[in-house]
Amino acid sequence: QVYPQGRGMDDTEKSWTIDGVTFKHVSQEELKFVYNNIESDLNRVTQKASADWIPADIYAAVRSGSTQLYLAFKDNYYAGFFVLTPLNSVTGEKTLYIWVAYSKPEYNIWEAGIQFLDNLIQGTSITGMEFHSDRSGWSRAAKKHGFKAVTTVYRKEV
């Protein structure tokens, strides 16, 4: 169950707690203060996966308002983050694109993170979630959380 934080606090603060993990929305104004803390983790993600983006792309997308950043905290310690972009298909269907999901190795926020994402889109016009990965281990984890493979992309650089 999702418990919004901040009772008695500023209503503009968006945060939710699930199974001891708090997910906090980072506003465009807060981004410049938060970015230095996540930039090294964004670099880790690009090194592990063949990402077609660089950390500065994330900063620009969140700053523009087209993308949302949520930080995760466990026991009041930074545990990871989600970078999310709502997408519209040509048919008008809306999808939540999980651009980047990161959990610090010493924390396991995936169960709470998927539950957070499920609850985040409830009551919206978003009909599904998707992410891309070239890492084969994600096929097992994705299936466990209700995701299914839709397509496989192969690329050859020329």
Where are these regions (language model features)?
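Active-site/acyl-donor-binding loops of N-acyltransferases
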Residues: 4, 10, 131-158
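Active-site rim helix/loop that mediates acceptor-substrate recognition in acyltransferases
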Residues: 48-67
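Acyl-donor binding region in acyl/amide transferases
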Residues: 91-145
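A residue-level signal for beta-strand positions that form part of recognition/binding surfaces
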Residues: 20, 95, 151
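Short amphipathic alpha-helix that is part of the acyltransferase structural core
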Residues: 3-53
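Conserved donor-binding loop and adjoining core beta-sheet/short helix segment
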Residues: 64-107
